[in-house]
Amino acid sequence: MDRKHNGKAILLEEFCSMKLTDFIVEDAIITELKATDKESVIKEMVCALKDVQKINSKDVENVIKSLMKREELGSTGIGKGVAVPHTKHDCAKKIIGTIARSTQGVDFNALDGESVHLFFLLLSPNDSAGLHLAALERISTVIRDNDFRRFMREANGKAGMIEILKEVDGIHV
C-alpha cells in the first residue's frame, strides 16, 4: 500500500516499521561526551556527523543554529535522562542521526529537571515531515523502556551500544 506524503509515495510498511538502525549513523555514535552544556552537546554531535561525512563542513554552523532554535521553542530534554534534539535542514539528503552518552550528565533543561545522560540527535530533510515524525516516534517508543535506557547507559563502548540498537530493532546479532 502506498501513501502520498508531500508529493512523494512512501511505502506504508516502511513508514510504520522504521528502525533506529535505519537512520542512526553508527560511526558517529559518541560513547562519552566531552561537552558539559546544551549547545556544546549539540555541537559535538553535529561535528561527529560531519567527521563521518554525513554533513558538509560548510553546513555545520547552520545545523547547530537550527537545532538551538528548536531548543528555544521548548527543550528536547524529555525526562528520565534522555534528550532528543532534532530539526529539519536542507543539508540533509535523508534522515540521519546519532547517539551520545554522558556519564556525568548534562543540564539540558529537561522537563523533569534531571540531568541528561543519553542524547538522540535527529536531522531530516526539509520535505520529510512524515518520516521525521516516524523517526521521532521510533525513538520515543524505545526510550520509554527503562531497561533500554539502562542498557544504553551501561553498554560497553560503541560496539555494545550498536548491539543494543540492533537487538531493540529485532536484528539478530
Residues covered by each model-derived region:
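Cytosolic covalent-transfer regions centered on His/Cys nucleophiles
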Residues: 2-173
